[in-house]
């Protein structure tokens, strides 16, 4: 990139700025200064107004921007007005002035957020050309003064307000710079990577690691990386300007001007690092120099704006606010789906840490929210900033999040204190290893030894098993073997990444050390989760488990979070008398008031329910949990009152005593085998089929299509003259009858079996209706349905069907799974086959007949949502009769309460 050339001659903008400064001298008005000279770029449209008015002489309180044009640009020019509007919004201003030497106009933002014309100056309407500007200077200068004084009047009466330098620097300008340059940079990176295979491959490796963080925002690798490049530059420029008062080496940031290139900029910042640390903030993102010239001008503009506005003169508290808001903007722009909200991080730290004087760590630090919460809580209790920082450790696998993390934990009052921050995969962190950090005073190296930690607090990465990076597969294989050797429990290859990390962290904790983690809720309702839970018991005392009963913790993610509080113990067989507290938080953690937050923390730390409107708890011993889970009830149900299960356990049996589970078809190519409409296939090869439960409204269901099931070879079909069927097969094969699609799961490929037929079905992802539907005839079903068949030994199918749909049957379905981000229930075929039902053998013939009769009143109507269903008089009579038939009608209200409570928790995340 070539050097950017600046104007040497004094532009009219500089003349106007100078004249305004002179006229303000000694006036005693609220407008104290004017500026803007340093950001008058000539190569492109600037990010900033040509003239800035300030409410203070230090130029930290921006009042208004002016956009200047020569007379050949009309004052009504739409592009001019739009440009001025954009700049005002970026600076957080509610007014602007446009001036073309012929006319002047003041615009003020109305209550609806639109800028509307407030005043016009036309005293120089005779100025028509650039030459006239020079000729009639003496006539337009008084108009400039008149505009300034009018603006001052609007300032005095409150119509015009000053913008906050905090929001301007950390939000408005950063967002503006990113939005107007993202696609330019993306295109440039794409062009350059087409010339450089190493660059292309590096970008793809980066995208594989980070793409999930951009799923809600960017689905294009180049746009996502462009955004990261721009944030890398804005974060570094802002941070250097913010700390230069305290670290003189950072004054070198002023050298990034219009005569420099991006490579020069990196070298200037590297010089700052050599003298004063903050390496994690100042580290350049790879390929950050691959930006177009126009983008570099914007970055220089941003830097010069910070210099001209004397950011270093802002008081410490405001600077701290700028740093914090910069972190928020960076997180928002990246839209990291699982970034930890600060209130959640603060609560997690306080319910986990036992001794604030000991070393604490977040080894999946991400953007540093948890580490910041640790430092803040330490500082409040031990009253020594140096010790708070010295005993807090943070690391992450990737360097980029640590740039934001370093800014997040930076304390303007404690800039000279080294930060224990390093880049390492969590599986590679070892106690006793040496790391090098920088002394922020002189840039010298400091060698630190990783200690055993008193506490580790982390939001573990929500990475599904099939998305784990290749470089971590080896670690996972090693830990799978270690866990099996220690516990006898085998983790399958479909176990998610977070399931392994607590076992690694065990090594890094001191004796009785505490671990507080946020993980996905999937472990609460799956076989894999059951293995995880049981293996944890060998390594840790599980003290508390928390989930939300009031909105989700992560607003921009579909993942539902849980908190686990663990205490390290000797690896040994679990003590089944140990008790676990299962907590429901009843306040929105992201908006919880301070008093309620304190109540929540007190409750969990003391294992005591203090205010049920804030949090409720259910407590179980490990042996209680083992007993409950044998009835097909998941861990997810333990947050609710299910103590009544002890009263009913002798009256229930596994549903597999009455039903056989049927495997739904997984064809690999549905269009070959699922027939909906006319076809040339012979009728004898077509069987009734149900693909989905979406349209099932009642307790009975009918097939909604046909399935192609052929048990004959091609030769047999030819011999039998089955030309229509052969025609269908040829539609999906070559001349040799070999399949065009390689994903088909049958052998021979066209022979889907017809023997797997179901009598009953239910959905894998039910929502507000919980029921099992009976099919009018035995049908083939798709894999997405949970399908069952009556066993030949069943004497009374009507009774079994009724019992499956009783209040206990609905509870059994709800209690078997866990909630997903969309609010639906997630249950699996393997999990479902473990649920129990009321044992029909224990019901008398008389009661059975009455139950069937009562069920017939609801069987033929539409299934209602649970709340409505339970309010229905016929339903109540049926459910109470079922419970009365086993001598436990008194449990009706308990079961109803449990069912409604579980549904509320599942739906509150929407």
Which residue ranges define each predicted feature?
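Signature of N6-adenine DNA methyltransferases within the class I
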Residues: 43-46, 91, 96, 103, ...
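P-loop NTPase catalytic cores that bind/hydrolyze ATP
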Residues: 222-249, 458-459, 499, 507, ...
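Class I S-adenosyl-L-methionine
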Residues: 246, 276-351, 819
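Amphipathic alpha-helical coiled-coil/heptad-repeat segments
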Residues: 806, 846-910
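Catalytic centers of nucleases
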Residues: 32-57, 452
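Polybasic, glycine- and aromatic-enriched phosphate-binding surface used to engage nucleic acids
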Residues: 626-853, 857, 863
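Charged, often flexible domain-edge or linker segments that flank or initiate folded functional domains
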Residues: 49, 54-56, 60-69, 74-85, ...
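Acidic-basic catalytic patches of nuclease active cores, encompassing PD-(D/E)XK
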Residues: 1-40, 44
């Amino acid at each position: 990139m070539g050097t950017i050339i600046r104007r040497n001659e004094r532009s009219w903008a500089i003349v106007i700025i100078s004249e305004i400064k002179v006229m303000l001298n000694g006036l005693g008005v609220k407008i104290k200064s004017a500026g803007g000279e340093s950001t008058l770029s000539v190569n492109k449209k600037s990010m900033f107004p040509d003239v800035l008015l300030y409410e203070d002489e230090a130029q930290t309180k921006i009042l208004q921007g002016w956009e200047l044009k020569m007379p050949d640009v009309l004052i009504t020019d739409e592009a001019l007005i739009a440009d001025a509007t954009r700049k005002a919004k970026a600076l957080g201003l509610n007014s602007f002035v446009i001036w073309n030497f012929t006319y002047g106009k003041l615009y003020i933002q109305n209550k609806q957020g639109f800028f509307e014309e407030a005043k016009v100056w036309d005293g120089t309407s005779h100025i028509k050309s650039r030459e006239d500007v020079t000729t009639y200077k003496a006539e337009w200068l008084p108009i400039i003064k008149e505009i300034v004084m009018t603006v001052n009047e609007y300032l005095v009466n409150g119509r015009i307000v000053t913008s906050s330098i905090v929001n301007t620097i950390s939000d408005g300008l950063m967002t503006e710079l990113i939005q107007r340059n993202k696609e330019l940079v993306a295109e440039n990176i794409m062009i350059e990577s087409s010339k450089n295979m190493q660059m292309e491959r590096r970008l793809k490796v980066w995208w594989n690691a980070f793409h999930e963080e951009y799923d809600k925002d960017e689905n294009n690798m180049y746009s996502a990386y462009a955004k990261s490049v721009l944030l890398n530059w804005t974060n570094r420029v802002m941070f250097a300007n913010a700390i230069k008062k305290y670290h003189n080496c950072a004054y070198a940031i002023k050298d990034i001007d219009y005569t420099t290139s991006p490579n020069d900029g990196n070298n200037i910042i590297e010089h700052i690092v050599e003298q004063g640390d903050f390496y994690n903030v100042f580290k350049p993102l790879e390929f950050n120099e691959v930006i177009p010239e126009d983008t570099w001008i914007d970055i220089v503009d941003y830097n010069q704006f910070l210099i001209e506005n004397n950011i270093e003169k802002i008081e410490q508290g405001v600077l701290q606010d700028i740093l914090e808001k910069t972190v928020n903007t960076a997180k928002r722009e990246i839209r990291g789906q699982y970034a930890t909200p600060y209130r959640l991080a603060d609560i997690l730290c306080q319910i986990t840490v036992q001794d604030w004087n000991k070393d604490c760590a977040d080894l999946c630090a991400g953007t540093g929210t948890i580490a910041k919460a640790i430092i803040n809580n330490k500082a409040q209790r031990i009253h020594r900033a140096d010790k708070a920082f010295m005993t807090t450790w943070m690391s992450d696998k990737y360097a980029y999040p640590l740039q934001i993390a370093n800014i997040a934990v930076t304390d303007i009052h404690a800039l000279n204190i080294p930060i224990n921050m390093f880049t390492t995969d969590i599986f590679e962190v070892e106690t006793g290893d040496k790391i090098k950090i920088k002394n922020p005073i002189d840039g010298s190296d400091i060698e630190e030894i990783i200690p055993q930690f008193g506490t580790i607090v982390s939001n573990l990465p929500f990475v599904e098993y099939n998305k784990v990076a290749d470089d971590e597969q080896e670690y996972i294989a090693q830990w799978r073997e270690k866990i099996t050797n220690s516990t006898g429990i085998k983790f399958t290859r479909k176990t998610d990444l977070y399931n392994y990390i607590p076992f690694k962290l065990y090594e890094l904790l001191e004796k009785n050390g505490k671990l507080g983690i946020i993980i996905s809720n999937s472990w609460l309702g799956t076989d894999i989760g059951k293995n995880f839970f049981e293996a944890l018991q060998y390594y840790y005392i599980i003290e508390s488990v928390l989930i939300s009963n009031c909105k989700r913790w992560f607003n921009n993610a579909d993942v539902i979070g849980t908190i686990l509080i663990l205490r390290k113990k000797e690896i040994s067989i679990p003590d089944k008398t140990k008790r676990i507290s299962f907590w429901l938080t009843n306040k929105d953690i992201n908006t919880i008031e301070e008093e309620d937050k304190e109540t929540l923390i007190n409750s969990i730390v003391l294992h005591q329910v203090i205010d049920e409107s804030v949090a409720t708890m259910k407590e179980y011993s490990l042996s209680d949990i083992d007993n409950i889970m044998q009835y097909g009830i998941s861990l997810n149900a333990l947050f609710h009152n299910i103590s009544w299960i002890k009263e009913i356990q002798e009256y229930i049996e596994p549903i597999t005593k009455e039903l056989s589970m049927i495997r739904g078809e997984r064809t690999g190519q549905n269009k070959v085998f699922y027939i909906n409409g006319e076809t040339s296939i012979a009728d004898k090869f077509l069987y009734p089929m149900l693909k989905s439960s979406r349209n099932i409204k009642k307790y009975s269901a009918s097939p909604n299509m046909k399935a192609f099931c052929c048990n004959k070879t091609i030769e047999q079909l030819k011999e039998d003259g089955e030309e229509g069927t052969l025609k269908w097969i040829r539609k999906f094969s070559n001349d040799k009858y070999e399949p065009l699609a390689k994903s088909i799961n049958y052998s021979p490929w066209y022979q889907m079996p017809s023997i797997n037929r179901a009598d009953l079905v239910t959905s894998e992802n039910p929502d507000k209706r919980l029921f099992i539907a009976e099919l009018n005839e035995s049908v083939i079903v798709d894999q997405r349905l949970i399908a069952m068949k009556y066993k030949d030994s069943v004497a009374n199918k009507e009774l079994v069907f009724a019992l499956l749909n009783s209040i206990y049957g609905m509870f059994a379905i709800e209690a078997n799974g866990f909630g997903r981000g969309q609010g639906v229930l997630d249950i699996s075929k393997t999990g479902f086959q473990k649920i129990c039902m009321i044992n029909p053998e224990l019901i008398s013939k008389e009661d059975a007949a009455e139950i069937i009769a009562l069920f017939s009143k609801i069987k033929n109507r539409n299934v209602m949502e649970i709340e409505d269903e339970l309010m229905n008089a016929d339903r109540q009579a049926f459910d109470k009769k079922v419970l009365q038939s086993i001598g436990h009608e008194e449990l009706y209200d308990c079961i109803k309460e449990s069912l409604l409570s579980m549904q509320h928790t599942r739906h509150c995340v929407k």
